[in-house]
Amino acid sequence: MVNCDLFVSLHQIIGMLEVKDAKIAVGGQTLAAGLSFMARDGQLTCITGPEGSGKTTLLRTLMGFLPIGSGYVSVDGELLTVKSSQAFRRMMAYLPQQIQQLRHQLMPVEAPVCEAETYGVWNALLPKAVVTEMPAPLLPEEIFQLVEQTLSDAKGKQIIIADEPAAHLTPELTLRLLQQLRDQADAGKTVLIASRRPLLVEHADLVIEMNQNT
């Protein structure tokens, strides 16, 4: 069971993420061993490394979706585990690598054309429609709009986690993204990103290199 006192203490959490002597592994492959760092509030921390080095796996571990092999992860001194992670995720805003998953946020909400009960009956009887085409890929401007909107909606979140947020952005939009992330850090938040973009890596306060020898 999750300690009920944890929910109370979350209101007092600053947001610092600490990783100590961590072993990160997936599918029997060790991606990092003895990994230690602190992602402090008010700073931009960037996890970088080649494709397949474990950046996304590390982020998922820090969010409590994956167990840590050894060592520990804590948030302002409170131990983060798979069991306690749900409480901690309430104070996190997450931008996934596949940001297209949030594309519905760009679409206006449409009113239903029939009552929910009626829809349920007919939906069970009628043959399912076949989707013949996939949605068009989002343009860089639309992706940036999603990132901007997600960050704007995260005013009450103390920790910002973003997985390759600039992957599909133009250099100009990447620069604007950097300013957005900086604004979040300047507001006293913990900002943790995974990125291979030189601009983001160079302007991070702390850079964590992921490779087989980490």
Q: What does each of the following model-derived ranges do?
A:
Residues 98-129:
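Q-loop/switch helix immediately C-terminal to the Walker
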Residues 71-79, 88:
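Conserved ABC transporter NBD signature motif
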Residues 63:
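Helix-to-loop junction immediately C-terminal to a conserved catalytic motif
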Residues 17, 32-34:
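Conserved structural motif at the start of ABC-family nucleotide-binding domains
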Residues 197-202:
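Conserved H-loop
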Residues 48-50:
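The feature captures the beta-strand-to-loop junction immediately N-terminal to the Walker
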Residues 162-165:
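Walker B catalytic motif
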